């Protein structure tokens, strides 16, 4: 009589291969440690330190008072979609039909998830620059796709090389995924690179996913262009964005997605069976943000710019070479001169000086040797964080010099 086969515990067998293939977030474990500590300055979470502007909050409160506590259309409120259409036309010169080409989502994260799940078939390859936001690869995997990385390097200002993108294309390539301005590097796409990527997308008949959540946070001479506004790109681009970063509305969870009607119709299928609609009161607040919040955006952007200069100068002065970010609100200093790898650097900095940063490897293999520091916290806290980091870097170098 054959012995019964030994099966793995149900908890292990219950999870799908896709879920098991994705490791836990490289960021989360540091925040689990951080939660147990006091006097910590966190440069880890990518969240504005500003509260949502008062008039936007009041719009949400008024929405509640008016009893707007029911579902909206799957697509979102008509008023918000119309305002978004005007915004995209006025700022980027790209026209969308608010009835059939715009979708309001639960944050830009849902937009990314929807876009991928609605368009990826098993085994489809999606070309993705890296370092890049930690959620992109899992979203591709959960959709059944395969991420194909194109590394970017500090020595090249983390610029995406169109020739490298084209070299990565195979018969299985479905799409190109762009997340610019870039989290974690702060890099942007120059007009020349954008144009070259657009030509590649047309030449190889690729879909383009473009997450532009940081579009309003650009510095210096850089001016953002929506990828769908480029020649030939509107019909093949799924454009995504949201209100969290520019308007300090992370907790409201409102994003958006713009795509040709034929593509959006399929995306809405995924949305309506999973989410139904974004929260009504949050959409009402987002409408006021979009229509009346320009001064708020500029006020916060100017302060981020002031902090950006402080942090970049501070890192460079302590010998941590740092690319000058042109967008978003992150610095990505190179820490190899300390003799530590990025994970050890981040762990020890948290334990010894109570400053939280994120190891660069969490954003892809070419992020190793760097850490991400978010400067969306107060100027005074950033000044203190730089003092602590400088002290820690000095100790690390002294330790390295003392080794035989």
Locate the predicted segments by residue:
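N-terminal Rossmann-like NAD(P)+-binding subdomain of aldehyde/semialdehyde dehydrogenases
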Residues: 30, 63-87, 91-92
């Amino acid at each position: 009589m054959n012995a019964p086969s030994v099966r793995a515990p149900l908890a292990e067998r219950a999870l799908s291969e896709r879920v098991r293939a994705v490791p836990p977030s490289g960021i989360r474990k540091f925040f689990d440690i951080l939660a147990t500590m006091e006097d910590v300055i966190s440069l880890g979470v990518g969240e504005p330190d500003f509260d949502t502007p008062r008039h936007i909050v009041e719009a949400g409160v008024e929405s509640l008072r008016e009893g707007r506590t029911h579902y909206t259309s799957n697509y979102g409120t008509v008023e918000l979609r119309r305002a978004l259409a005007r915004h995209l036309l006025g700022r980027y010169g790209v026209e969308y039909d608010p009835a059939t080409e715009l979708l309001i989502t639960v944050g830009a994260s849902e937009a990314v998830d929807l876009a991928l799940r609605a368009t990826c078939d098993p085994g489809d390859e999606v070309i993705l620059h890296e370092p890049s936001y930690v959620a992109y690869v899992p979203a591709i995997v959960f959709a059944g796709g395969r991420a194909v990385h194109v590394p970017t390097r500090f020595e090249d200002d983390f610029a995406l090389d169109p020739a490298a993108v084209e070299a990565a294309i195979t018969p299985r390539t479905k799409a190109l995924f762009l997340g610019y301005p870039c989290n974690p590097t702060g890099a942007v796409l120059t007009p020349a690179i954008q144009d070259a990527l657009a030509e590649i997308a047309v030449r190889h008949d690729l879909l383009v996913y473009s997450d532009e959540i940081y579009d309003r946070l650009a510095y210096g001479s850089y001016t953002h262009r929506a990828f769908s506004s480029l020649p030939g790109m509107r019909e093949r681009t799924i454009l995504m964005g949201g209100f969290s970063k520019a308007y300090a509305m992370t907790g409201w969870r409102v994003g958006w997605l713009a795509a040709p009607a034929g593509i959006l119709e399929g995306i809405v299928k995924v949305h309506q069976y999973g989410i139904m609609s974004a929260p009504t009161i949050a959409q009402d607040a987002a409408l006021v943000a979009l229509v009346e919040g320009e001064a708020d955006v500029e006020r916060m952007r100017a302060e981020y710019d002031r902090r950006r200069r402080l942090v970049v100068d501070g890192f460079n002065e302590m010998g941590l070479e740092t690319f000058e970010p042109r967008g978003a609100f992150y610095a990505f200093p190179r820490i190899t001169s300390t003799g530590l790898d990025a994970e050890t650097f981040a762990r020890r900095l948290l334990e010894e000086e109570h400053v939280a940063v994120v190891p660069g490897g969490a954003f892809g293999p070419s992020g190793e040797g760097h850490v991400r520091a978010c400067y969306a916290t107060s100027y005074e806290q950033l000044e203190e964080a730089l003092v602590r980091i400088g002290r820690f870097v000095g100790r690390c170098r002294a330790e390295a010099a003392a080794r035989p």
